[in-house]
Amino acid sequence: NESSVIVGKNQNTLSEINLDYIKENSIPVVRRQSGGGAVFHDLGNINFTFIASNNDNFSDFKRFTTPIIELLKTLDINAEFSGRNDLLINGCKFSGNAQYNYKNKVMHHGTLLFSSQISDMSNALKVKPIKFEGKSIKSVKARVTNISEHLKVPMDILEFKDLIIDYFYKTNTDNKYYTLSE
């Protein structure tokens, strides 16, 4: 999608965004049904979603993020799970994840920064001071990374998206493919 900011279900929108920058750049701000933190979307960001039956492991974020980590390993990128819902490369975040539960289903979704404009993200979102306690990191730019910066063989975002889809179908034959339309 074009640039937008998506805030979590329980967030105070004004405490998450740089309102002046948002207004100056006509960036839409929307609220999603799931929790989690505010995210900046642009054309360099890929979103993924898993919908599964809600069982004892529904809140296990590792269950849904492990396929992303394993895919990146095939590209010689060492990614890791961190905290409750983040994925990191070399200590820098490239993915945040959230979940929404309804009846007997869970929708797990995440962002993948592939070739996002980090400076735009940094300008659009406010960073909580607590994220910096005890750290010498001075900006969002120093704490996040794009997957494309770690690829041994360059590819564009469409090639990477196709790689994700192919990988999921090869590694899990139970996956169903849905094409959404208007």
Where is each model-derived feature located?
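Beta-rich nucleic-acid/ligand-interaction surfaces
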Residues: 81-98, 182
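Contiguous, small/hydrophobic- and glycine-enriched helical/loop subdomains that border
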Residues: 45-85
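Long, positively charged amphipathic alpha-helical accessory segments at protein N-termini or as interdomain linkers
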Residues: 68, 75-76, 95, 103-182
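A generic local secondary-structure boundary/capping motif
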Residues: 18-19, 38, 85, 95-103
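N-terminal lobe of the biotin/lipoate ligase/transferase fold
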Residues: 1-58
